[in-house]
Curated annotation (Swiss-Prot):
Family: Belongs to the GroES chaperonin family.
Pfam families reported for this sequence: Cpn10
Localization terms from the record: Cytoplasm
Main location: cytoplasm
UniProt keyword Lipoprotein present: no
UniProt name for this protein: Co-chaperonin GroES
Originating gene: groES
Native organism: Prochlorococcus marinus (strain MIT 9515)
Length: 103
């Protein structure tokens, strides 16, 4: 079997799932103290990298996702599946776990 090369462009979310590039977490506190990885909080903000086709309704139609590629979003803290890709952090989650679009 051939090896699969994963890149952001090859990840195609299914249904109402959204693929988000996680924003960098703070490296130090407001007072200037450097934080170890174990003390950093999991970021809840990221940029939409890929969008699924939308939720399938009972009548067979699709519900169009409310977010688009490039949108900056706020999502639930423990939502989705964490994925590392090319040194960057991503999360794959359901659209219902997105709380807001940030402008």
């Amino acid at each position: 079997m051939a090896a699969v090369s994963l890149t952001v462009s090859t990840v195609k979310p299914l249904g109402d799932r959204i693929f988000i590039k996680v924003s960098e977490s703070e490296e130090k506190t407001a007072g200037g103290i450097l934080l170890p990885d174990s003390a950093k909080e999991k970021p809840q903000v990221g940029e939409v990298a890929q969008v699924g086709p939308g939720k399938l309704n009972d009548d067979g139609s699709r519900q169009t996702p409310e977010v688009s590629i490039g949108d900056k979003v706020l999502y639930s803290k423990y939502a989705g599946t964490d994925i590392k890709l090319g040194g960057d952090e991503y999360v794959l989650l359901s659209e219902k776990d997105i709380l807001a679009v940030v402008s």
